[in-house]
Amino acid sequence: MNVLFFTSWYPTLLQPHFGVFVKEHAHAIHLAGHNIVVLALLVSKKKCLFQIKVEKNKDEAGVRTVVVQINSFLRDYLYHFLPFQYLILKHIYRKHIAADFKPDIIHSNVVFPAGTLGDWLAKSLNIPHVITEHWSRIKGALDMPFISGAIIKAYSKSAAIMPVSHFLKNSIQSLIPDLPEKKFSVVGNVVKTDLFHYKEKIVGTDEIRFCAIATWSHKKIPDKLPELFIEALANVQKKMNIKVKLIMIGGGDRLDELSVLSKLKDLNAEFRGFLGKEEICSILHSCDFLVHASTTETFGVGVAEALMTGTPVICSAVGALPELVNESNGVLCVNNIENWEEGIIGAINTKYNHRIIAEEVKARFSQHTIGQQITQVYDKLK
C-alpha cells in the first residue's frame, strides 16, 4: 500500500530526538512492506519574519522523507492558523510528491495540527485517513474554540484512530463519546530491539543500582516527580542497611536542585546528563532497577526500553504504565513517599526472571509487531 505518512513532530539535525517515536512508526510501516513517503511539516520559532526550507532525502532505513521547516517569530500564530499550514502542505505535496507517488492512504500523527491538516488533504484526494495518537494534551486543545471543531471533525471523519495505549484511547473516548468503538485500534510505540536487548544481570554486588531517565525540568504542571524516588531510596537505604546508587540520565533545569536534595538525603546519586540510546542501554544492563515517578504517561517509552533489557521497573501507577508494568516485571506505586518505600523494598526482595521480562516486551513492541498491527488496520480499509 502507498502510504503518505504526515506529521508535525519529526527528528531533524538540530532536534534529533523530537518526535523520534513517530519516525520509529514510519520505519515499522516501511519494514512491513508498504511504500511509504514521510512528509513532515515543522513550525519553529526563530528571529525572522518568515523562512521556509525543504529537505528531501532517503533516511538510514531507506524511507523517502520530505521535511518542510517553517521558521518565524510568529510561530505560535502560524502553528495554530490551520488554513496557512494547509496551503503550504498542498503546495509541497503537489511540487515534491504528487508527480511520482499516488497515496492510497494518508496516515497522520497526532490530531493537531497534523491530523486536522491530513483530514483536509485526504478529502481533497478522496482517500482514507487514519490517525496515530500520542498526544496527552487533547483535553486542553478541545477547550480552544478556534481548533476544537477541527479536532473533533478530524477524529470523526477518520477511517481509524490508533492511540498508543488503552489509557489514551479511554481518554479520547471520554472527551468525545460519540466516536464509535470500532474506529479504535490500540497500537503501541516501537522499542528498538537492535538497541535495547537482554543481557544477563550481574548478581552479588555490594550495592543495589537504580537508574532514572527523563528530562528533569520545571513545568507549570509537573509530569515527573524525581523527589519521590530520591527520598524513598534514601529512606530504604537506612531501613535495610544497604548500599544504594542512583544514576540520573537526562538534562533539564532541575539537575542542581536534585543534586542538592540527594546530598542532603545522603544518597549516592550520579548525574550523567543527556546520553545516547546506546549508552542508556549499557547503563540499564548494569542496573538492577529503573525508577520512574510521574503524574501521567500516554505510553512510557523509557519504561518499555528498560523492560526490553530485562530490567525490572518501579514506577507510578498512572496513565498507561499499568499496561506495561505488573508483578512479574516490577512494582506500581501510589505517588507518596511511604508507598514508594514499600514498592522499592518489595522489588528488592523479589526474584525476577529478567530474560522473560525482555522476551515479553519484545513480543509486544518490536518493529515487526508494530508494523503488522498497523498493516491490519490498513487492510480493513481496502
Specify the residue positions occupied by each region the protein language model found.
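Conserved donor-binding/catalytic core segment of Leloir-type glycosyltransferases
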Residues: 4, 202-224, 230-234, 247
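Aromatic "clamp/platform" in nucleotide-sugar-dependent glycosyltransferases that forms part
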Residues: 295
